[in-house]
Amino acid sequence: MTPDSPAVPQDDVPQGDVPQGGGAESVRSLELFFDLVFVFAITQIATVLVEHPNPGGLARAALLLAITWWMYGGYAWLTNALDLDRTGPRLMLLLGTAGFFVMSQAVPRAVGPGPWAVVFGAAYLVVVLVHFFAFQGTSGQRGIHRIGPYNLASALVVLAAGFVAPEQRVWVWALAGLMEWVTPWLSGVGGFTVGVGHFVERHGLAVIIVLGESVTEVGAAASHLDDLTTVLVGSLLALAASAALWWLYFDREEEASAALLERVPAEERPRAALWSFGYAYLFLILGIAVAAVGMQKAIDSFRHPLHGLPGALLPLGVALYLAALAAFHRALAGDWPRRRLVTAAAVLAAGVPALRWSSGGTALAVTTALLAGLVCWESAAQRGAALRSRDA
């Protein structure tokens, strides 16, 4: 089975409340507790890039995020099917939470020598096994029996990575990530059900989590600086940029995605969910994390040029977020939002030269201005479409 990208017409998208497809519940407090560990995981993965602001550090951070996000997403699918009012499922989710917590503890030191890469792999194996067994007796049992063996194989590869030299470990992680993300092409995604309301809300919270972590990290980094102007102006520019990223997803995209996913036939919905909230979302989350590190670097070099990869992280992360958001929209609506792609190209074209030849502050201001411009552009387009629809 090949998971072809679905296309659903965008016209007549409902604009009301996020639909609760299939009787899905809202996100429960235990899931929010689980998400606290994901906050920690994102912080730790960002630390890898902060401490190693070079192509190798970026590759390692991206691979660790890809591996982590695969199973975080898997747990979102799991809780979509679990009855968390029962003690057994609660304990299984808490056991998975413990596995994620140990993984997160190990992340920064897993890239170097010592036992931490083995600890990361062992915890990951626990997370995968808990995920498999927790699905038993749920609506996704048939689906996990198809995909579970591939998850187990990739987890064993992650564990094996801990026994190779740090220089070669990145290649083993790459193999594990590749195995995971091509799994749907091998096993298919049949056998799962997607309750739309809970599923969309769950993933929206992940975006909030990563955006919140980025604001916290930027604020903490700026607070260690002595220059008042740098701290205040830099922090506010970074906050405005993060707010624009929030706006671009939550102003309309989340609600529209729920309506579009609801309209996909139930048997095709897992594929649509995989393409939009799986593949596209990975790069969306990665874009926010990279942009957050780039904001920190830009504030650190607020009055001076910033060369090398650190000078590209801010525009690269923002452009990646916009491109991923465009791909997310394409996976569900069937068309490419050109305004986002144009702005992504503009951010790269303006942001990198500004960082390298002017200053971090200039680049941060330019990037924030471009994002604000995109927000205004999209808002004006939506108002125009609404007026045309009303007059028709």
What are these regions (language model features)?
Residues 33, 37-49:
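A structural signal for hydrophobic alpha-helical transmembrane segments in multi-pass membrane proteins
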Residues 44-57, 80, 109-110, 223:
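Short, hydrophobic transmembrane alpha-helix segments
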Residues 168-172, 358-368:
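Loop-to-transmembrane alpha-helix initiation sites
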Residues 2-22, 26-28, 62-82, 87-91, ...:
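Predominantly late transmembrane helices and immediately cytosolic-facing juxtamembrane segments
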Residues 154-162, 346-357:
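Alpha-helical transmembrane segments of multi-pass membrane transporters
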Residues 385-392:
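Short, charged juxtamembrane terminal tails flanking transmembrane helices
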Residues 332-335, 350-364:
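Membrane-helix boundary connector in multi-pass membrane proteins
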Residues 149-151, 340-349, 367-369:
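Central hydrophobic cores of alpha-helical transmembrane segments
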